[in-house]
UniProtKB/Swiss-Prot annotation:
GO terms for cellular component: cytoplasm. Mo-bis(molybdopterin guanine dinucleotide) binds at residues 260-265. This is Sulfur carrier protein FdhD. The lineage of its organism: Bacteria, Pseudomonadati, Pseudomonadota, Gammaproteobacteria, Enterobacterales. It comes from Salmonella schwarzengrund (strain CVM19633). The gene is fdhD. Belongs to the FdhD family. Signal peptide: none annotated.
Length: 278
């Protein structure tokens, strides 16, 4: 297995496909011309030789995705419990082959169920609706964020969406430092996958990534709140709205949830005590 921080083995340098498409502009159906379309491929996460889940995703940053998914789904508690990863082609997509510690693999097998994911779905494969909510330890109140610094982050969020700029087809998730500077970010055709990539990246970065908040370009679903809380993220900013279940989960696990983030304004759903307004 490769070191978990090494480059992925696939030489994937282009995450769009050019296709002949007809364009309509003000009652004029133009001749087909080349346009960019985002790639979306099945990605299987395979733990110690056993396929656990297949998600539809953009074919990049997949080791970060696998790390973030493993943490946010409670498969592992620490990056040290994954000994290595390889990304390899499979018949119709890609596999991330994960070398998981024996103790964690036994736990995974004990709870394993048929789980087939798809973009934007957090319930797929869950046997009982009561199993949707995962037990999450209430978050501490150790973080604060000055809302006056949010504008800077919003201005640069699309810097982490190069494929999105070409296709208009990706979501972004970025880590916002207390200063408003973006430490890093990831994009994907699936908003949950983009967040998992960010959470996986954060888990393997240095101490500077412990301070700050997550920012997503999409709405905030209950699953995104739950994933953030599972990884110790205390503040989640979303460009769009939050759902009722997301608000309920955020309230219960002490996560500060903020939606409709625009320059100079935002809607604070839960736990505003972490936020400073200049």
């Amino acid at each position: 297995m490769n070191n978990i921080l090494s480059e992925e083995v696939l030489n994937v340098t282009d995450f769009t496909t050019s296709r002949q498409l007809a364009l309509w502009k003000r009652e004029d159906l133009q001749s087909p011309q080349l346009d960019d379309v985002a790639e979306e491929v099945p990605v299987a996460l395979v733990y110690n030789g056993i396929s656990h889940v297949v998600m539809m995703a953009s074919p990049k940053d997949l080791t970060h995705f696998a790390m973030g998914f493993s943490l946010s789904e409670g498969i592992i508690d620490s990056p040290r419990e994954i000994y290595g990863m390889d990304v390899v082609p499979s018949c119709n997509g890609l596999e991330v082959q994960i070398d998981l510690s024996s103790r964690r693999f036994m736990g995974l097998k004990a709870r394993r169920r048929a789980l087939a994911g798809r973009t934007g779905c957090g319930v797929c494969g869950v046997e009982q609706l009561n199993d949707i909510g995962k037990p999450v330890q209430p978050l501490p109140f150790s973080q604060t964020f000055n809302l006056g610094n949010l504008d800077r982050a919003l201005k640069h969020l699309n810097d982490f969406q190069p494929t999105g700029k070409l296709t208009g087809c990706t979501h972004a998730a970025a880590w916002v430092m207390p200063s408003g500077e973006l430490a890093g970010g990831h994009e994907d055709v699936g908003r949950h996958v983009a967040l998992d990539k960010l959470l996986g990246r954060r888990a393997t970065e240095g101490e500077e990534w412990r301070q700050g908040a997550a920012l997503v370009s999409s709405r905030a679903s209950y699953e995104m709140v739950q994933k953030s809380a599972m990884c110790g993220v205390e503040i989640l900013f979303a460009v769009s709205a939050a759902t009722t279940l997301a608000v309920d989960v955020a309230e219960r696990c002490n996560l500060t949830l903020v939606g409709f983030c625009k320059p100079g304004r935002a809607t604070i759903y839960t736990h505003p005590q972490r936020l400073i307004a200049d």
